[in-house]
Amino acid sequence: MSKNIHDVAYGLQKAIADHTDFKTLKESYAKVQGDADSKQLFDTFRNMQLEIQQKMMQGQEITEEDNKKAQEVIDLIQQNEHIKKLMEAEQRLNVVIGDINKIIMKPLEELYSAYQA
């Protein structure tokens, strides 16, 4: 009898939550939230990201002013140790999730590549 795919997915969810990189991300996020300056800067960064994504999804042009504002916020973020560590932890976790995604998508990749000969 085959495993319930949703049970496997929930197992993967738990494994990610227990993973060292996720725990480091969680700790880093708590430090950002615990420091008023870091929290304000991080919130500004997230809002800016969302605004730019929304513009892109709506087909609106990203203006020079948008780019300048984004670069200013990024420059400030790179000087903030708490946010810098948070972003590094997020990058490490994204690599893990990317690897997992490749593994999950392998059956589809093999299926489609089998008929390209």
From Swiss-Prot:
Belongs to the UPF0342 family. It comes from Bacillus cytotoxicus (strain DSM 22905 / CIP 110041 / 391-98 / NVH 391-98). Pfam families: Com_YlbF. This is UPF0342 protein Bcer98_0695. InterPro entries: Com_YlbF (IPR010368), YheA/YmcA-like_dom_sf (IPR023378). NCBIfam families: PRK13676.1-4 (NF010211).
